[in-house]
From Swiss-Prot:
Chain intervals with Polar residues compositional bias: 182-194, 265-286, 354-367
Record's GO cellular component terms: cytoplasm
Biased composition range(s): Basic and acidic residues: 338-351
Family designation: Belongs to the TDA11 family.
Classification lineage: Eukaryota, Fungi, Dikarya, Ascomycota, Saccharomycotina
Protein name: Topoisomerase I damage affected protein 11
Localisation: Cytoplasm
Bias kind Low complexity: ranges: 14-31, 48-58, 302-312
Coiled coil: none
Keywords: Cytoplasm
């Protein structure tokens, strides 16, 4: 058996590509074997068929490429190829033979215009029309690739969203199942007599709770810190309310003392004199007299305010008045905190019911105490009366 390409087959293919007319004519070879017009590929002949004289010599390489291009064109069946057919090889051996156009490399991926360019030397040997066609095809391939990338990106984003939603659903279902299993197991817990087993079980339950809380979605636990924040703020304000109230009270007391210093006083001295050590101690009688002086009638205050002495008051005098009022306030606080001396003196004196005399505790403790020195109240009164008459 001899595998040879049929010359009539090549002529029929070239005739069908060059003209859009009907099928090629069917003739018989010299050997008597009919050449079928619908057959493709190689013809299997038992005997070697002679080549006709009229047909030009065609190489095997051109035959294989033309049969491959013809089959690919029939598979695609695109309208662009029928309207604008690409240049094909001519049958005449004497005419110029143009190179074939490259086929799409990624046709299986849905890319119709992604062609592989030939070498630079081959492109330079082509005409300007062919070069422009290559350029247009390459631009269309780039646009097609960009569209494909945008479609793939949209598909990727959609897949990521679906994956995130599916994860949330799975986490919720797992949380429900774990919580249901935990409640069921807690109802039917075995009461073991060994405390070690109980401790191990409690630690396992704690670890399960921690894993569930960490695996759960963070969106569920967002409102929890919002609820805890008001509690912490309320505790903070409750702790600060006491010192703030104390400061406010002290401020109000200072303000009252400052207002008292602005009210005209009874003393006629324009320049305040420095206070002695005796005056620094404020007794209840002095504080009462000071309050009585403050509560003066309106006529007296108006007359005092209209006096030129008050009008010509210096800032230094005001400062001294304010300082004196503050010192008086400090003395009042000290008096309220310390016990009065009169009560201590009263506690030291004792009253004798037998003779009606008062005896001091210090004198009783003294060793030189004599009972004759004590006098009764009637004798003391009579002696005082006699002294008054003599005078």
């Amino acid at each position: 058996m001899d595998l040879t390409p049929s010359p009539r087959k090549h002529r029929s293919v070239s005739h069908s590509q060059s003209s859009d007319s009907g099928p090629p004519s069917s003739t018989k070879s010299n050997s008597g074997v009919p050449a079928g017009s619908n057959r493709k590929g190689f013809n299997i002949n038992i005997a070697v068929s002679p080549i006709s004289v009229s047909s030009p010599p065609v190489s095997h390489k051109h035959t294989l490429t033309r049969s491959h291009s013809h089959s690919s064109k029939h598979r695609r069946g695109s309208s662009a190829s029928t309207n604008n057919p690409l240049p094909q090889l001519l049958e005449d051996a004497d005419g110029p033979q143009l190179p074939e156009w490259p086929q799409p490399a990624n046709e299986s991926q849905g890319l119709r215009y992604n062609l592989e360019l030939p070498s630079d030397e081959h492109l330079a040997s082509l005409d300007i029309d062919d070069q422009l066609k290559f350029l247009a095809l390459k631009e269309m391939g780039i646009v097609e690739l960009k569209d494909k990338i945008s479609q793939l990106n949209s598909i990727l984003h959609k897949g990521e969203k679906d994956l995130h939603r599916l994860r949330e659903l799975v986490q919720r279902s797992l949380y429900k199942e774990m919580s249901a299993g935990y409640t069921g197991s807690s109802k039917h817990v075995r009461q073991s007599s060994n405390p070690r087993d109980e401790a191990i079980a409690s630690t396992k339950n704690r670890t399960r709770r921690r894993t569930l809380s960490s695996s759960s979605s963070p969106s569920k636990y967002l409102p929890v810190p919002e609820q805890s924040e008001p509690d912490s703020k309320s505790r903070l304000w409750s702790n600060l309310s006491k010192p703030l109230g104390f400061i406010q009270q002290f401020d109000s007391m200072l303000q009252n003392e400052f207002e008292r210093s602005l009210i005209p006083q009874v003393s006629n001295s324009a320049n305040p004199q420095p206070r002695t050590s005796e005056e620094s101690y404020q007794s209840p009688l002095r504080s009462r007299s000071k309050n009585n002086d403050v509560d003066l009638p309106t006529e007296w205050t108006s007359s005092r305010s209209s006096s030129p002495q008050r009008a010509s008051r210096n800032p230094e005098e005001m400062f001294q008045a304010v300082s004196s009022s503050i010192w008086s306030f400090v003395n009042d606080v000290r008096e309220n905190m310390l016990p009065p001396r009169e009560e201590e003196e009263k506690d030291k004196e004792l009253y004798n019911l037998d003779n009606g005399s008062t005896v001091s505790v210090e004198n009783m403790n003294n060793s030189d105490y004599d009972e004759t020195t004590t006098e009764t109240l009637p004798r003391r009164r009579s002696r005082q009366n006699s002294n008054a008459i003599d005078k």
